Regions:
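Short gly/ser/thr-rich secondary-structure transition/capping motifs
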Residues: 36-43, 114-117, 180-181
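Short beta->alpha connector loops at strand-helix junctions that form conserved
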Residues: 82, 87-89, 116, 136-137, ...
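N-terminal Rossmann-like NAD(P)+-binding subdomain of aldehyde/semialdehyde dehydrogenases
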Residues: 1-48
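Residue-level signal for inorganic ion chemistry
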Residues: 20, 81, 112, 133, ...
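ALDH superfamily catalytic-core signature
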Residues: 107, 140-198
């Protein structure tokens, strides 16, 4: 399946750049210490909230939007001060190879790595005690990720696909609804998880 270049630019690279633009002006405030009031019995103590990195985040991304769901959570992990191990889908080998080359070329290899491969490599990664796991994909593998993370009490972010039903009631303009549903189900061709189920 060949994704149109314009869609990749808009729906993947563009959204990653939007995320970075959102993070950049806020990063100093997010990283700053914030004073917190203390209970009067603890006076004259002073309290602070300090953001700290979790450590190493594992990002497991899908084949349908590999750039978006690899680099957007990577930008978030970096903004939080974390290292990243990225596992792109084996079903998008060319894109995964380009991402691996870019990260090896421009990022510190002590802090950022890409592991390519299939289910066997993913299983080996899930045996490791990561500090956070971000997974985008189906519910079946999501439950495997969750079970593996539970062994180490690793926090998990799951962005799971599924059915996207469409409800059209009697007040809807049927011509408009039909066009929108047809567009959503046939663009790219219907690969994103948020497209209506046809």
């Amino acid at each position: 399946w060949d994704k149109p270049a314009a869609e990749t630019a808009l729906m993947e690279i563009g959204l990653v750049l939007d995320e970075i633009r959102f993070i950049k002006p806020r990063l100093g405030r997010w990283a700053a210490r914030h004073p917190k009031p203390m209970h009067y019995l603890l006076q004259p103590a002073v309290g602070w909230t300090v953001a700290e990195p979790k450590g190493v985040a594992l990002i497991i991304s899908p084949w349908n939007y590999p750039v978006l769901f690899s680099f957007e959570p990577m930008a978030d992990a970096i903004a939080a001060g974390n290292c990243v191990c990225m596992k792109p889908s084996e079903l998008s080998p060319h894109t995964s190879g380009v991402m691996a080359d870019l990260i090896a070329r421009y990022m510190d290899p002590q802090a950022f790595r890409v592991v390519q491969g299939g289910p066997q490599e993913t299983t080996k990664l899930l045996e490791q005690p990561f500090n956070h796991i971000f997974y985008t994909g189906g519910g079946k593998v999501g439950s495997i990720v969750m079970a593996a993370a539970a062994k180490h009490l690793t926090p998990v972010t799951l962005e799971l696909g599924g059915k996207s039903p469409v409800f059209v009631d009697r007040t809807a303009n049927l011509d408009v609804a039909a066009r929108r549903i047809a567009w959503g189900g046939s663009s790219t061709p219907g690969r994103p998880a948020w497209h209506p189920t046809m």
